Regions:
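Extended alpha-helical targeting/anchoring segments
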Residues: 1-516
Length: 516
């Protein structure tokens, strides 16, 4: 019988602070490989819950078919030692120093396999699955948080004839952290808990010392974020004439039946030396169900996303997709305030727009198909249809599709089957993704991927990376797309991308000009 791996989890109450960016500034600003996840209620905009991954024991990074595991401390070295034998059976393992870091090269997936065989094959998702399964018996589930990039999908779909230009941006296909210290905050009850995960018997004293240090620092929160002046000049990779040209060219592919709907996008870039302050401003301006700040060694990613990517609850095995498609700008008056009458008129216009309805229903149908691929027969249903959610600059049509995951599959199988979400690609999905690469001619990096977490009891909660900034070398890249169908107006689609990028651009510009 296999020995149960050692794990000791301590949990202690810590002082509650409503301002999670101040906590992050105090505990994590100097730590790469840290993550902040916030959530707010859609209607009231009140804060709900927050998770702060303060420091990690192991970093797991995927690029192409290679997954690299790096121990960030002695606690993490024990994890690597224990998972190495399992991973060596799934792929080719290589390392300079096995104690600190090793890589696993997985065989490329055979695209001729049927759907179920693809899901059962060893893939790069096993990099996360092996760790999660290793600690599945832990009474307190271990926590893996991070990013799935959009371009992870290129390992799973035919890419013949697609050539992408180097845009100077580097982003792994996925980057996840195995939490060593994690704060969970319930804003409704105003309670906070620090959980510390020790994976090595020899490191229990050291892990306890770190936890004590964190608890002490929480008594003196530093909410002052330093701000540097910066330009608020915005550039884009496709100006309006070029972008409307892409929309027109894609319309040909809709006409000939290659796709019914597709989501071209473009990127807006500006200086962003004040990432945490910009995130705090975005939270203030545009509270959303999924807000995130990821401090990676290679990049910083922050955003306020309205849209769940994939959500899975192991207690009832419910899988959920929350398609958002169809939008209108909010109804502002001449002074920049919401005019309720104009806002209501724009909502009515959105609800009655046949193009928006058609686009939305196509994507609900695509979500139903995605759910059906991995769920038990007869369990799929549309739980909510065409509701309206409001955000600071934009309103959306939303629906919710659910199903019961098949017993032999887990949430990572479901993500593999469903990526990338139809609201960021189109339908049919694989052809739409191939056309997107063909016309955009570059990687999307984090945009359209997913950020969130996986726990060792199987829970999975991710949002689509939209309304977000990917920051590298001091430059923020904000990408936004538009849902194109046969009767789309190219200029209106270009305008839609600006509306969607507006909240993040505004937050960064507000901070950049504050210090002047």
């Amino acid at each position: 019988m296999k020995n149960t791996p050692f794990i000791a989890v301590t949990s202690q109450p810590v002082p509650y602070h409503a301002d999670t960016t101040a906590i992050f500034n105090t505990l994590c600003q100097q730590n790469s490989n840290s993550l902040l996840l916030d959530s707010a209620e859609i209607g009231s905009k009140n804060s709900l819950q927050s998770l702060i991954l303060i420091n990690a024991a192991v970093k797991i990074t995927c690029l192409g078919n290679q997954v690299t595991f790096r121990a960030l401390n002695a606690n993490g070295k024990q994890v690597l030692k224990e998972i190495h034998p399992v991973l060596s059976q799934l792929g080719t393992v290589s390392a300079v120093n096995f104690d600190n870091e090793f890589s696993v090269q997985f065989a490329p997936l055979d695209n001729q396999l049927d759907e179920d065989s693809k899901l059962q094959a060893a893939t790069i998702f096993d990099g996360l699955r092996v760790i999660s399964n290793h600690y599945q018996h832990s009474s307190t589930p271990v926590f893996l948080g991070g990013l799935f990039a959009y371009d992870l999908v290129a390992n799973f779909i035919p890419m013949q004839g697609v050539e992408l230009k180097d845009d100077g941006i580097t982003c792994p296909d996925y980057s996840f952290y195995l939490a060593e210290n994690l704060i969970t905050i319930d804003h409704q009850s105003q309670q906070a808990t620090l959980k510390s995960f020790c994976f090595s018997q020899e490191e229990q004293v050291e892990v306890a010392k770190t936890a004590l240090s964190i608890a002490q620092k929480l008594k003196n929160i530093d909410g002052v974020l330093s701000i540097k002046a910066a330009s608020d000049e915005i550039s884009t990779n496709f100006e309006d004439p070029e972008f409307t040209g892409i929309v027109k060219a894609l319309k040909h592919h809709i006409n000939i039946g290659d796709v019914f709907q597709i989501v071209p996008s473009r990127r807006f870039s500006l200086a962003c030396p004040n990432t945490l302050a910009s995130y705090a401003q975005l939270k203030l301006n545009n509270p959303s169900p999924y807000m995130f700040y990821m401090n990676d060694e290679e990049f910083i990613l922050f955003g306020a996303s309205p849209e769940s990517a994939l959500k899975y609850a192991p207690d009832n095995r419910q899988l959920e997709i929350y398609p958002i498609a169809g939008s209108r700008p909010r109804g502002f008056d001449a002074h920049g305030n919401i005019d309720p009458e104009l806002d209501a008129r724009l909502e009515l216009e959105l609800r009655l727009d046949h193009k928006e309805q058609a686009e939305h229903l196509m994507l609900v149908d695509l979500a139903r198909n995605d759910i059906a691929r991995v769920c038990q027969s007869g369990t799929r249903k549309v739980a909510e249809l065409m509701q309206v959610d409001r955000y600071s600059h934009i309103m959306h049509l939303v629906s919710r599709v659910v199903g019961k995951l098949r017993p032999e599959l887990d949430a990572l199988h479901a993500y593999q089957a469903c990526m990338n979400m139809g609201t960021l690609t189109g339908a049919p999905k694989i052809k739409a993704m191939q056309l997107i690469y063909q016309f955009e001619q570059q990687k999307r990096h984090s945009y359209g991927g997913a950020v969130g977490y996986l726990t060792s009891d199987g829970r999975f909660d991710t949002c689509i990376v939209i309304r977000s900034a990917f920051v590298q070398n001091g430059i923020a890249h904000i990408q936004a797309g538009c849902g194109e169908v046969l009767d789309s107006d190219p200029q209106m689609e270009a305008d839609e991308t600006r509306h969607k990028a507006a909240a993040v651009l505004k937050a960064i510009k507000q901070i950049n000009t504050q210090a002047k």
